[in-house]
């Protein structure tokens, strides 16, 4: 056998898997036609990227009977994403494995390329996942640690960060330490957060696990300043001893005009089905090259070069880190393949305009809530310490009761922070208008009148 490794693309991988033997043409070409006809039959929404489309919420199929301020939990697909999903779904329904053979190699790469363009990184640094939680699990399960090494996280992080770290602690005795960054979120400051982080980093700290925007309060961490503090702590350390700044970025990704590279983080996990308005059940992990070297794959990839390595009885050393850490197996293909359209939607809208719009609506909501007697806004007013999430306490009333009354009495959809301390939570986004915010404010005011 030649020392030169054979190249095998994903199509060949599927053929070798016995799924596509003898398939030479795209079955179900009518699937494309059917999907196009279905898209044309929808209401006449403006195309993403047009001038009208920048303020036209008709791109989303949200129930007009409600003011929905919870699309940050699970996105409503904009029209271009719906069309792409239906196009691929029609092809898969008509041709199944035949369509998969034709489409999968191209559209998987297109999804990764679009994500990389949005992130401003090489595509080989991007792993595709199903969610933030999956990405965090992959990150923390196989972070290379030695006895005595520790991971520092915070008391403000979500279950999706705490639980994989707890499981890792059980598995091999890794030390996980939690710190507190602030007491009252509405009074937080950049200096206080950075001081808390700096004081927590020790010689055996190997990773700092944080969340960009806290879903418990709406606090947005000053990641650039935290990254600078980590860099100072890393002076004089070798590559293995270096502290990695690992981030759950889901409530900033798609809402903020910044990328993980801009922010100076090392590892970044996010779902694409929240503020990005991408296909439900999609996500990604990005890591810098030095950070990928510290993360071992968990689930076998279906990348063709890794399959060749298996055939030839060797390790997949030539597979780039992003594809190597993309979990293999069959998944919701039509949703992952529509990621490209989601990133294009944001590109055409303008990432800076998305952030500006999101902040403007959140500011309107925070200021309005603060003017209502009995309401304490827990999210900082400072836009450098907040994003789109807005949390508040209403006359010390149970948040769950308030959410139910808002929905039943006022047709306003809000949520409860999923933590031991519960607040009423809103998330105005580009799927909303000023009138939605005003209606929510009127509803809250009526509850405390």
State what each model feature region is.
Residues 2-6, 12-449:
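Pyridoxal 5′-phosphate
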